[in-house]
């Protein structure tokens, strides 16, 4: 009887330890899906983001706090609609985690966008900004902005100063994404 109790106790402890680190994370989600044919992934240095010529010193220092961007996009088509729904649900579950604080949410022309961050409340700085955008006809994109002591308010101000954000401004990036894999 003591042997069974010991085995059961050890099994429970091992199960508890195994489950502690098993919660899904964005990093793990990226790694698990970057080679899937339905996804496109990019790792971009912050140097690819440009500010307007008359950008403020504050916007320039905010951009300097950003190190890189990880982009993972699910490209939806008729053949993968079921997987699209499944993957969208997975991403939403991950970013619902309490460690992510919502910064802004908006809907426009059938697109949903959520911006969240993870960081320190003590000094109002963040180390990861997450942008999730969904378009029911095209798929979704997940962007992780990684940096050191980024400030959410300053990032929002800087976004207003980012140069040419029209269709032509992203044409090169769109062409690159089409040819990836």
Provide a role label for each language-model segment.
Residues 27-93:
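Early exported N-terminus immediately downstream of N-terminal targeting peptides
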Residues 78-81, 86-112, 177-180:
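Function-determining sites in protein domains
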Residues 21-24:
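Bacterial signal peptide processing site
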Residues 94-148:
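Surface-exposed, polar helix/loop patches in the mature regions of secreted/periplasmic/lumenal proteins
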Residues 1-8:
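Bacterial N-terminal signal peptides that target proteins for export
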Residues 16-19:
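C-terminal motif of bacterial Sec signal peptides marking the signal peptidase cleavage site
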Residues 149-181:
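C-terminal partner/receptor-binding element of secreted or periplasmic proteins
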């Amino acid at each position: 009887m003591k042997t069974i109790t010991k085995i059961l106790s050890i099994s429970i402890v091992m199960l508890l330890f195994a489950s502690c680190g098993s919660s899904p994370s964005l990093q793990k989600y990226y790694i698990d899906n970057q080679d899937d044919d339905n996804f496109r992934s990019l790792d971009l240095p912050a140097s690819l983001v440009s500010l307007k010529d008359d950008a403020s010193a504050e916007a320039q220092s905010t951009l300097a706090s950003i190190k890189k961007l990880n982009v993972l996009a699910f490209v939806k088509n008729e053949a993968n609609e079921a997987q699209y729904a499944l993957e969208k649900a997975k991403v939403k579950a991950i970013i619902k985690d309490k460690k992510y604080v919502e910064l802004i949410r908006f809907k426009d022309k059938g697109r949903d966008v959520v911006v969240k961050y993870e960081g320190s409340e003590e000094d109002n700085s963040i180390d990861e900004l997450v942008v999730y955008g969904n378009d029911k006809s095209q798929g979704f994109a997940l962007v992780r902005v990684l940096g050191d002591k980024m400030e959410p308010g300053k990032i929002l101000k800087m976004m207003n100063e980012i140069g040419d954000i029209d269709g032509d401004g992203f044409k090169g990036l769109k062409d690159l994404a089409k040819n990836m894999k």
